[in-house]
Amino acid sequence: MRQTKTGILLANLGTPDAPTPEAVKRYLKQFLSDRRVVDTSRLLWWPLLRGVILPLRSPRVAKLYASVWMEGGSPLMVYSRQQQQALAQRLPETPVALGMSYGSPSLESAVDELLAEHVDHIVVLPLYPQFSCSTVGAVWDELARILARKRSIPGISFIRDYADNHDYINALANSVRASFAKHGEPDLLLLSYHGIPQRYADEGDDYPQRCRTTTRELASALGMAPEKVMMTFQSRFGREPWLMPYTDETLKMLGEKGVGHIQVMCPGFAADCLETLEEIAEQNREVFLGAGGKKYEYIPALNATPEHIEMMANLVAAYR
């Protein structure tokens, strides 16, 4: 019997190619055109997106990207490439490709890269620890479209999420412990997850339950009392209600109530990006301190740390 050759596809959201209005506009147009992200009627959404949102948001968002841009590109791209390279070194006999739902490198280029290595089985690992239709679902949709155009289709193992994976929880816990050791134990550990519209959850997306699972498991691993750990949701967009409580409003409230020291972690982000480095580490720090808080630290994402790479290797091993 011929031995199966397996490849690994690491999938993430994507990023603009440059911190310029033009590049950001191209990226946002692709991102906000996906029905998994915004499912508003196209008759209403297209004019709003093209006539208002893209012209107004692109220059502002480009400035935010410029504030966190790294020598090798956006933080998400730099850390994602590091993850790909480190996992390939950890699994030298297994091709590892990186693909993004939006922007470059595309998911299609990642699939083609693996097929060029003559793999007949692909393990797809969306780097979203907590499932959501708007993230993991978008990877699934695009993968299906890509394979629909192929004459030969490899076997596919698709990892839905890993919200309560033991290695993942331990890696988070060790990162928190290191931060506590460096900065002192805070009055509160705030876990901020990317939000989604409340309507998506009402219609069946189990994302909030998966976030609660991670929060519960992490608090347990740390041995922290429930009242010392709080879960919030960030990065809301548009006018409809999103998952609550909102991170920025919660930080303002906590500062006003006299909570002095907070540390913030974003467990749903496998790699640091604009939403963590600018929104959480900078904007929300100003919100908390401006409301009366005294001390605020952001705990970095797991990025390409050895513990994170080992977690990925162990996670995909069950599907190889």
UniProtKB/Swiss-Prot annotation:
<keyword id="KW-0627">Porphyrin biosynthesis</keyword>
<dbReference type="Pfam" id="PF00762">
    <property type="entry name" value="Ferrochelatase"/>
</dbReference>
<protein>
    <recommendedName>
        <fullName>Ferrochelatase</fullName>
        <ecNumber>4.98.1.1</ecNumber>
    </recommendedName>
</protein>
<keyword id="KW-0350">Heme biosynthesis</keyword>
<comment type="function">
    <text>Catalyzes the ferrous insertion into protoporphyrin IX.</text>
</comment>
<dbReference type="InterPro" id="IPR001015">
    <property type="entry name" value="Ferrochelatase"/>
</dbReference>
<keyword id="KW-0456">Lyase</keyword>
<keyword id="KW-0479">Metal-binding</keyword>
<dbReference type="GO" id="GO:0006783">
    <property type="term" value="P:heme biosynthetic process"/>
</dbReference>
<keyword id="KW-0408">Iron</keyword>
<dbReference type="InterPro" id="IPR019772">
    <property type="entry name" value="Ferrochelatase_AS"/>
</dbReference>
<comment type="subunit">
    <text>Monomer.</text>
</comment>
<feature type="binding site">
    <location>
        <position position="194"/>
    </location>
    <ligand>
        <name>Fe cation</name>
    </ligand>
</feature>
<comment type="similarity">
    <text>Belongs to the ferrochelatase family.</text>
</comment>
<feature type="binding site">
    <location>
        <position position="275"/>
    </location>
    <ligand>
        <name>Fe cation</name>
    </ligand>
</feature>
<comment type="pathway">
    <text>Porphyrin-containing compound metabolism; protoheme biosynthesis; protoheme from protoporphyrin-IX: step 1/1.</text>
</comment>
<keyword id="KW-0963">Cytoplasm</keyword>
<dbReference type="InterPro" id="IPR033644">
    <property type="entry name" value="Ferrochelatase_C"/>
</dbReference>
<dbReference type="GO" id="GO:0046872">
    <property type="term" value="F:metal ion binding"/>
</dbReference>
<dbReference type="GO" id="GO:0004325">
    <property type="term" value="F:ferrochelatase activity"/>
</dbReference>
<dbReference type="GO" id="GO:0005737">
    <property type="term" value="C:cytoplasm"/>
</dbReference>
<dbReference type="InterPro" id="IPR033659">
    <property type="entry name" value="Ferrochelatase_N"/>
</dbReference>
